[in-house]
UniProtKB/Swiss-Prot annotation:
Component of the small ribosomal subunit. The ribosome is a large ribonucleoprotein complex responsible for the synthesis of proteins in the cell. Part of the small subunit (SSU) processome, first precursor of the small eukaryotic ribosomal subunit. During the assembly of the SSU processome in the nucleolus, many ribosome biogenesis factors, an RNA chaperone and ribosomal proteins associate with the nascent pre-rRNA and work in concert to generate RNA folding, modifications, rearrangements and cleavage as well as targeted degradation of pre-ribosomal RNA by the RNA exosome. GO terms for biological process: chordate embryonic development; maturation of SSU-rRNA from tricistronic rRNA transcript (SSU-rRNA, 5.8S rRNA, LSU-rRNA); regulation of cell cycle; ribosomal small subunit biogenesis; translation. It is found in: Cytoplasm; Membrane; Nucleus, Nucleolus. It comes from Danio rerio. It is a lipid-anchor. The lineage of its organism: Eukaryota, Metazoa, Chordata, Craniata, Vertebrata. This is Small ribosomal subunit protein eS8. Belongs to the eukaryotic ribosomal protein eS8 family. GO terms for molecular function: structural constituent of ribosome. Pfam families: Ribosomal_S8e. Residues 1-27 are annotated as: Disordered. Component of the small ribosomal subunit. Identified in a IGF2BP1-dependent mRNP granule complex containing untranslated mRNAs. Part of the small subunit (SSU) processome, composed of more than 70 proteins and the RNA chaperone small nucleolar RNA (snoRNA) U3. Keywords: Cytoplasm, Lipoprotein, Membrane, Nucleus, Ribonucleoprotein, Ribosomal protein. Residues 8-26 have a biased composition (Basic residues).
Length: 208
């Protein structure tokens, strides 16, 4: 028996049975869930109604995540699934679905922030810098360029919660694309009230 998205197999509201009037139709078909996992990219192409294509991601390990307040979007590695409002089973099996909360690698965002503001981010006090990082952060600049960075630094403040995550090297992000439909796991970095909300939820789950 195929997966069917009809409603004539259900009983009537009165509890009586319905006699099937026709066989299952092609337009009523359903397909098994993608259950996208974290791993080297594996995507299947599916031919769907109208000759269109869907991209069923079976495994993904990177995605495009946008840091909204800084208008910075970077491709970064997905590390882990930490929360899912709809189903804890999907967290246990590390399944990537829309609106699940994941941990992503913070390195691309830190590199962008340091080159944009020429300020260190997510570094422990007195940590050694590599020659390249030294070049970016403590470079001799002309007065004109220095003025530009000074102006930028007025808006360089980020929230303590985000700073804490940068120290750990991982950011909480939310997936906003549908991996089983478009074959991508793209989303946004959690900030502000939304970040506080999910941190509370994750903490409550750990406490159980």
């Amino acid at each position: 028996m195929g997966i069917s998205r009809d409603n004539w197999h259900k009983r009537r509201r009165t509890g009586g049975k319905r006699k099937p009037v026709h066989k299952k139709r092609k337009y009523e078909l359903g397909r098994p869930a993608a259950n996208t996992k974290i791993g080297p990219r594996r995507i299947h192409t599916i031919r769907v109604r109208g000759g269109n294509k869907k991209y069923r991601a079976l495994r993904l390990d990177v995605g495009n995540f946008s840091w909204g307040s800084e208008c910075c979007t970077r491709k970064t590695r997905i590390i882990d699934v930490v929360y899912n409002a709809s189903n804890n089973e999907l967290v246990r099996t590390k399944t990537l679905v829309k609106n699940c909360v994941v941990l992503v690698d913070s390195t691309p965002y830190r590199q962008w922030y340091e080159s944009h503001y020429a300020l260190p981010l997510g570094r422990k006090k007195g940590a050694k810098l590599t020659p390249e990082e030294e070049e970016i952060l403590n470079k001799k600049r002309s007065k004109k360029v220095q003025k530009k960075f000074t102006l930028r630094r007025k808006t360089a403040k980020i929230s303590p919660l985000l700073e804490e995550q940068f120290l750990q090297g991982k950011l909480l992000a939310c997936i906003s694309s549908r991996p089983g439909q478009c074959g991508r796991a793209d989303g946004y970095v959690l900030e502000g009230k939304e970040l506080e909300f999910y941190l509370r939820k994750i903490k409550a789950k750990k406490g159980k």
